[in-house]
């Protein structure tokens, strides 16, 4: 599998780019979010990649961040969403915006992405709930990135117990920083039961 490419950007034709890595040109499709953040042709670039092998083609998709690639991987697991549709979704909204829309069950926002109707948007909410993490501060529902590994572990445990991402993050806000995971989960569960 090709996980990452570092080389010289030699072509930019939306949504495709070509990166020269030691004399070998790798063609990759990228989201428009990634495309707009690329350096000029001739400059050095690094992309996280996902290789998809089909009967008739080997397709390489590139992403500016590992988080965007992780979101892409979750999207292509959703029934009815292929690689090109997933790339279209990530072109229409950032990974954080997608995570927020899923957490808020915003079917209207999700169905505004190309190739996504109401039923597919509802399926996305159902299948992606709790699997995407927003790292952007928006309306106070999402914390920046977790301040400590313990916080992330506590949220992960609550998600595994069936709580929504919104509930888990809200419950963890009441847990003092530096609390170990076991105690943190206990306190977070107490917050949820209030």
Curated annotation (Swiss-Prot):
Residues 144-147 are annotated as: Flexible linker. One of its GO terms (cellular component) is cytoplasm. Belongs to the RuvA family. Has three domains with a flexible linker between the domains II and III and assumes an 'L' shape. Domain III is highly mobile and contacts RuvB. Residues 65-143 are annotated as: Domain II. It comes from the Bacteria. SUPFAM superfamilies: DNA helicase RuvA subunit, C-terminal domain (SSF46929), Nucleic acid-binding proteins (SSF50249), RuvA domain 2-like (SSF47781). It holds the Pfam family RuvA_C. It is found in: Cytoplasm. The RuvA-RuvB-RuvC complex processes Holliday junction (HJ) DNA during genetic recombination and DNA repair, while the RuvA-RuvB complex plays an important role in the rescue of blocked DNA replication forks via replication fork reversal (RFR). RuvA specifically binds to HJ cruciform DNA, conferring on it an open structure. The RuvB hexamer acts as an ATP-dependent pump, pulling dsDNA into and through the RuvAB complex. HJ branch migration allows RuvC to scan DNA until it finds its consensus sequence, where it cleaves and resolves the cruciform DNA. This is Holliday junction branch migration complex subunit RuvA. CDD domains: UBA_RuvA_C (cd14332). One of its GO terms (biological process) is DNA recombination. Residues 147-194 are annotated as: Domain III. Its main location: cytoplasm. Homotetramer. Forms an RuvA(8)-RuvB(12)-Holliday junction (HJ) complex. HJ DNA is sandwiched between 2 RuvA tetramers; dsDNA enters through RuvA and exits via RuvB. An RuvB hexamer assembles on each DNA strand where it exits the tetramer. Each RuvB hexamer is contacted by two RuvA subunits (via domain III) on 2 adjacent RuvB subunits; this complex drives branch migration. In the full resolvosome a probable DNA-RuvA(4)-RuvB(12)-RuvC(2) complex forms which resolves the HJ. It comes from Neisseria meningitidis serogroup C / serotype 2a (strain ATCC 700532 / DSM 15464 / FAM18). The gene is ruvA. Residues 1-64 are annotated as: Domain I.
């Amino acid at each position: 599998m090709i996980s990452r490419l570092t080389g010289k950007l030699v072509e930019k034709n939306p949504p495709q780019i070509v990166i020269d890595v030691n004399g070998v040109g790798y063609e990759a499709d990228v989201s428009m979010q990634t495309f707009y953040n690329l350096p000029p042709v001739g400059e050095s670039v690094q992309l996280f990649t996902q290789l998809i092998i089909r009967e008739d083609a080997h397709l390489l998709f590139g992403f500016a961040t590992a988080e965007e690639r992780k979101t892409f991987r979750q999207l292509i697991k959703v029934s009815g969403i292929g690689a090109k549709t997933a790339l279209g979704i990530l072109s229409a909204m950032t990974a954080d915006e997608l995570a927020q829309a899923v957490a808020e069950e915003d079917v209207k926002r999700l169905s505004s992405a190309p190739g996504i109707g109401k039923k597919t948007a509802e399926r996305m909410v159902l299948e992606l709930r709790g699997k995407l993490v927003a790292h952007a501060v928006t309306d106070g529902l999402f914390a920046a990135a977790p301040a400590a590994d313990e916080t992330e572990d506590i949220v992960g445990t609550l998600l595994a117990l069936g709580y929504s991402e919104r509930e888990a993050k809200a419950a963890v806000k009441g847990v003092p920083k530096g609390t170990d995971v076991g105690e943190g989960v206990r306190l977070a569960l107490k917050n949820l039961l209030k």
